[in-house]
């Protein structure tokens, strides 16, 4: 299986021939190598509603007639205010089967809203992490989150092949907490740091994360690079 990193928290993969993207922050992101005008996707998974994750979901969903998977509140917002036709609302603890595999949403400690041009934020449900099971592999995208001990419970229930974990600090875990989460709680086969160096407030050296992780393998990916397993 091949999973591609495209800056911030954007991940692309294919499962059973279907094209899936997570948190498509493309336009306005000079760390992303994708073109939202030409990208083809069948499914879009959203961890939460902040602009650097919500990103280009409306453009991608409407142009591709893609199905958007995320919190029930977020899906209601997309269908009511942006005319997105294909939405699948879920919540923490829920699992659903799709033709690329299964998606289960798990807890994340963060917030979730979208701020309109007038400065008014819209509540978009709970932030969530994602467990994807596809082609016999298990992927844990933690979403934006702080450290919490139930990461161990999540990994006990779903032994993780690849974990995408934020290291940027300020808004999410930094290197110290992220490496602790990997070493003590999640213990994946492969760890990939995300959500760093997109903005000055989240500048980090991923090599420090790699040095701190003592479990499995750490792969530091540049935008456009992939992990295969």
Curated annotation (Swiss-Prot):
Residues annotated as transmembrane: none
GO MF term list: hydrolase activity
InterPro entries in the record: Metallo-B-lactamas, RibonucZ/Hydroxyglut_hydro, UPF0173, UPF0173_UPF0282_UlaG_hydrolase
Keywords: Hydrolase
Record flagged with keyword Hydrolase: yes
Top-level taxon in the UniProt lineage: Bacteria
Family the UniProt entry places it in: Belongs to the UPF0173 family.
Listed name of the protein: UPF0173 metal-dependent hydrolase SERP1270
């Amino acid at each position: 299986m091949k999973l591609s990193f495209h800056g911030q928290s954007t991940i692309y993969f294919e499962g059973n021939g279907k094209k899936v993207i997570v948190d498509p922050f493309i336009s306005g992101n000079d760390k992303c190598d994708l073109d939202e005008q030409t990208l083809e996707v069948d499914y879009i998974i959203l961890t939460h509603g902040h602009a650097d994750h919500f990103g280009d979901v409306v453009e991608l969903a409407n142009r591709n007639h893609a199905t958007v998977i995320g919190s029930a509140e977020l899906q209601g917002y997309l269908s009511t205010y942006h005319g997105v036709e294909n939405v699948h609302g879920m919540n923490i603890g829920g699992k659903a089967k799709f033709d690329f595999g299964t998606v289960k949403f798990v807890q994340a400690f963060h917030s979730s809203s979208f701020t309109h041009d007038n400065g008014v934020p819209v509540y978009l449900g709970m932030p969530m992490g994602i467990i994807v099971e596809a082609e016999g592999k298990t992927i844990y995208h933690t979403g934006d989150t702080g450290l919490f001990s139930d990461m161990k419970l999540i990994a006990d229930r779903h032994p993780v092949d690849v974990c995408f974990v934020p290291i940027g600090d300020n808004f999410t875990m930094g290197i110290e907490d992220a490496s602790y989460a990997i070493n003590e709680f999640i213990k994946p086969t492969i760890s990939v740091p995300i959500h760093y160096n997109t903005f000055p407030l989240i500048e980090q050296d991923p090599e420090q994360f790699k040095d701190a992780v003592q479990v499995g393998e750490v792969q530091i990916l540049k935008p456009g690079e992939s992990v295969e397993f």
